[in-house]
Amino acid sequence: MTSSNLIKQLQERGLVAQVTDEDALAERLAQGPISLYCGFDPTADSLHLGHLVPLLCLKRFQLAGHRPVALVGGATGMIGDPSFKASERKLNTEDTVNEWVEKIRHQVSPFLDFDCGENSAIAANNYDWFGGMNVLTFLRDIGKHFSVNQMINKEAVKQRLNRDDSGISFTEFSYNLLQAYDFACLNKNHGVALQIGGSDQWGNITSGIDLTRRLHQQQVYGLTVPLITKADGTKFGKTEGGAVWLDPKKTSPYKFYQFWINTADADVYRFLKFFTFMSLEEINALEEEDKNSGKAPRAQYVLAENVTGMVHGPEGLAAAKRITESLFSGDLHDMTEADFAQLAQDGMPTVELNRDADLQQALVNAELVPSRGQARTMIGSNAVAINGEKQADPEYVFTDADRLFGRYTLLRRGKKHYCLISWL
């Protein structure tokens, strides 16, 4: 992406929900590099897919020559953003928040270049300026610039005030002031002139623009990326097991890869624009190729490879592909012990069994059949495989050779029903 028409390029990819004073921002970007920031509050010990679009937007700006600031909210994470939340957030302890700050800082770092000259990325923590601030300073220097009338009319706050079952505490009500002051501080300390964030952050961003103008007489800008939705109306970034996390210990690279492989045809080309750095020409050519091939589309695999490689690196991508191909072919010889651990983590149903369990009992415990009698029938009809090999003996007893790495056995009933045994 080039700096001269960066906003237009982002719009062509569907990455702009709202922007303040678009013409003035476009003109400012055309004049030369700026500093911009995006904030990430430590409300959990990992970022999730919802954070990926704004994080990648920071990267897009850096690739165009601008300087990104990744702000982790060590202070705001102690409060919790009420924007469009149905109820009060749970307040976490300071130790917990500090631990999460470090984890999120570590997650953000690989996406940005912190050693590339004048536009090297900066990592910041808003606890640095809020940690030593007393309440009188907060009220005198920040609070006096805010009208309560305007604050309660912000859509994110109005929704909470209008709920019969939940109002809003002064703690969360004050969050808007904290995020606004972040913008003013970063403007003063690093010359930050643009804040980007999710579309739910619009009210907080515009407050920061107003406060920066009042405190420093600087014109600054805001840009939000859209809330990602799926064509069928269901939430993006969720599975039956909950959120899809960027931390491989919470969502394994295999499950992460499978999430993208299962993208609907109606969504995949749009998601390629959101989540990859492929050019629009490349994406359009891929769509045309898929349309005319008469085969299953390639786009899902291109998307899965791009995003998994970006988030989990070459080794994580290789493991995800290796597991996928092994399960598809039934040949498990290329799988490593770590690959089986990914399956046990979240890749498929897993059951722990004592080593004296026979095949019939294993099928019942794995919930692949309802009874030992049904297990006998399934085994006898050649519908059961152990580690990819069919087993037709109803009286079969497992041997050490079935326990891969001394610990794992993969059962399959039919073509699609799997369970991983973890032997005790």
UniProtKB/Swiss-Prot annotation:
Transmembrane segments: none annotated. Homodimer. It catalyses: tRNA(Tyr) + L-tyrosine + ATP = L-tyrosyl-tRNA(Tyr) + AMP + diphosphate + H(+). It comes from Yersinia pseudotuberculosis serotype O:1b (strain IP 31758). Keywords: Aminoacyl-tRNA synthetase, ATP-binding, Cytoplasm, Ligase, Nucleotide-binding, Protein biosynthesis, RNA-binding. One of its GO terms (cellular component) is cytosol. The keyword Aminoacyl-tRNA synthetase applies. It comes from the Bacteria. SMART domains: S4 (SM00363). A motif ('HIGH' region) lies at residues 42-51. This is Tyrosine--tRNA ligase.
